[in-house]
Amino acid sequence: MTEFRETEQSAADLDEETLFLVAQTFKALSDPTRIRILHLLSQGEHAVNGIAEKLNLLQSTVSHQLRFLKNLRLVKSRREGTSIYYSPEDEHVLDVLQQMIHHTQHD
């Protein structure tokens, strides 16, 4: 039998906005390209061209995915000269991502 931990809020207490944002976050994590980008960013800050090069992706693809992730506040950016550097906005989502990676690799 599976036991569920008690949380501060029951499922019935979740408001529509919270449900929507949680669903959007899982949607973000459902895309292999976004997972690869987040995993790379979990190792340190990178510029768009560096992400594209390391992941063998087009810069336009990386920029599009970073916009998506930034809109969900999963990544943040900072400008240095002509380059924009990206890093994780919040470690919580990275923790979930790492747990899922570990879960899928577990025998």
Curated annotation (Swiss-Prot):
Pfam families attached to this UniProt entry: HTH_5
Location of the DNA-binding region in this protein: 48-71
Binding, Zn(2+): 90, 92, 103, 106
Keyword Membrane: no
Places the protein is found: Cytoplasm
Boundaries of every HTH arsR-type domain copy: 14-107
Listed GO CC annotations: cytoplasm
GO molecular function, a single term: DNA binding
Alphabetically ordered keywords of this record: Cytoplasm, DNA-binding, Metal-binding, Repressor, Transcription, Transcription regulation, Zinc
Described purpose of this protein according to its UniProt entry: Metal-responsive transcriptional regulator that represses transcription of cadA and the czcD-trkA operon by binding specifically to their promoter. Binding of zinc causes the repressor to dissociate from the DNA.
Misc: Can bind copper. It does not affect DNA binding but it inhibits zinc-mediated regulation.
Name of this chain's protein: HTH-type transcriptional repressor CzrA
Species whose genome carries this gene: Bacillus subtilis (strain 168)
